[in-house]
């Protein structure tokens, strides 16, 4: 299963490292990533493969939420099908 991880918040050092670190800890493969900084706001979208994730989805979401809280950023994990449906015109 694929998912989209979005990260939004005030730019700070180590955002990509911390999010990718959680991915590594949970055996989540990062397939694509894009990020930009708009007026000191950091925005990142990661496409990830959850097929080898080592924990249940609830635990995975909790781990990303915790990292987001410590960085004071919003981190969301959305299944790719849901993300695609939400952004289809």
Task: List each language-model region with its residue ranges.
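A conserved regulatory-domain signal marking ACT and ACT-like small-molecule sensing domains
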Residues: 1-89
């Amino acid at each position: 299963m694929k998912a989209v991880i979005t990260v939004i918040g005030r730019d700070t050092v180590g955002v990509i490292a911390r999010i990718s670190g959680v991915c590594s800890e949970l055996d989540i493969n990062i397939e694509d990533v894009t990020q930009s900084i708009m007026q000191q706001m950091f925005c990142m979208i990661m496409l990830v493969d959850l097929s080898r994730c080592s924990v249940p989805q609830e635990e995975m979401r909790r781990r990303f939420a915790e990292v987001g809280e410590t960085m004071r950023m919003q981190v969301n994990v959305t299944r790719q099908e849901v993300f695609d449906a939400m952004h289809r015109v």
